[in-house]
Each structure stands twice: as C-alpha cells, then as structure tokens.
C-alpha cells in the first residue's frame, strides 16, 4: 500500500487529504478517488492539471509512497501578460 497526500486550494479554502492506495495507482486515478470534487463543486477531476511536489505530471504517472499530488487551477491570465501589466503599472 502507498500513503499519499492530495491537495487543492482556493484563495479562501484549502484541503489536504491523506489516502491509502494500491501499488501501481496512477496520479489521475488517485485524484478521481480523492472525492475532492465533492468538496469543491466547480472542480473537474477528469481534466484538472495535476502535479507531484510542484512539478506537472502526465495522467498515467504511477505514484510512489509519500507523494503529494497537487490539483492545479486554470490560469486566470497568461504569466507573460501579467508581467507586462505589472511593469506597465510600475512605470506609471
């Protein structure tokens, strides 16, 4: 058995859940089993980007004992555009 954590957060609420899973479980399968979509109704675990310890991973990545799966939210603005706006605001 593997013991992993899965985390998801919004600005006002974060959830960290510990799970016991069978060897060979993939990152997407674990996310779907987590039940986080029952806590956050706008969360779609079938398509949400996933990562392990801050690094994006493919859906079929097998988990290792102690992994922390992170469920990422979609970007609200392109990072390059956000930087341009910050620089523009500083110049004004």
Curated annotation (Swiss-Prot):
Lineage: Bacteria, Pseudomonadati, Pseudomonadota, Betaproteobacteria, Neisseriales
Taxonomy, superkingdom: Bacteria
Protein name: UPF0125 protein NMB0796
InterPro entries attached to this UniProt entry: Mopterin_synth/thiamin_S_b, RnfH, RnfH_sf
Family under the similarity heading: Belongs to the UPF0125 (RnfH) family.
């Amino acid at each position: 058995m593997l013991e992993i954590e899965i985390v998801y957060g919004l600005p006002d609420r974060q959830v960290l859940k510990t799970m016991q899973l069978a060897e060979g479980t993939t990152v997407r399968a674990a996310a779907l089993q987590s039940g986080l979509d029952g806590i956050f109704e706008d969360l779609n675990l079938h398509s949400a980007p996933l990562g392990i310890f801050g690094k994006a991973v493919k859906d079929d990545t097998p988990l290792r004992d102690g992994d922390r799966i992170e469920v990422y939210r979609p970007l609200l603005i392109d990072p390059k555009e956000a930087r341009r706006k910050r620089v523009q605001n500083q110049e004004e």
